[in-house]
């Protein structure tokens, strides 16, 4: 396990993110505090990774790790091996590489991600994450 250290006080708002990108039916707001990246995801009703992101990612499934907290909405996740779960408001979640995901219902999915967020702004990442 890696040791994590916070070196300085840092406070930032998603209302004034370091980066904001709005690919198909999504908004990603990224802030960096100290050396840590945190992202707010807003996924609109009808958003599905295999439809909205797969064409840019060029992989059969999302190959990123995600560790997050759902603020509102619902997100259905299905892994490549057939595992399936629904993320609801107030749930924490960990998603391994090799999954599809989609918004359930008519309410946007709003989440905050702590692992996986750094790839949202990385210029040499795979597809969708490189665009954010």
Name each model feature, range by range.
Residues 1-42, 50-51, 126-132:
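A short, N-terminal "cap"/entry segment at the start of jelly-roll beta-barrel domains
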Residues 59-77:
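Short, conserved beta-strand element in jelly-roll/cupin
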Residues 79-98:
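Short acidic-glycine-tyrosine-enriched beta hairpin
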Residues 96-121:
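Ligand-binding loop in jelly-roll beta-barrel domains
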Residues 48-49, 73-78, 101:
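Short beta-strand segments in beta-sandwich/barrel cores
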Residues 39, 83-85, 110:
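Short beta-strand segments
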Residues 48-62:
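Catalytic core of non-heme Fe(II) oxygenases with the double-stranded beta-helix
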Residues 41-43, 68, 93:
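Conserved GNAT-family N-acetyltransferase fold
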């Amino acid at each position: 396990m890696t040791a994590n250290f916070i070196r300085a006080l840092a406070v930032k708002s998603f209302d004034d993110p370091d980066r904001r990108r709005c690919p198909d039916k999504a908004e990603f707001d990224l802030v960096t505090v100290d050396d840590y990246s945190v992202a707010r995801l807003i996924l609109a009703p009808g958003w599905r990774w295999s439809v909205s992101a797969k064409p840019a990612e060029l992989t059969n499934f999302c190959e990123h790790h995600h560790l997050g907290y759902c603020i509102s909405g619902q997100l259905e996740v299905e892994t490549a091996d057939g595992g399936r779960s629904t993320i609801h408001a107030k749930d924490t979640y960990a998603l391994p590489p090799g999954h599809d995901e989609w918004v359930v219902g008519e309410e946007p999915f709003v989440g905050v991600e702590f692992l996986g967020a750094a790839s949202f702004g990385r210029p040499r990442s795979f597809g969708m994450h490189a665009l954010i």
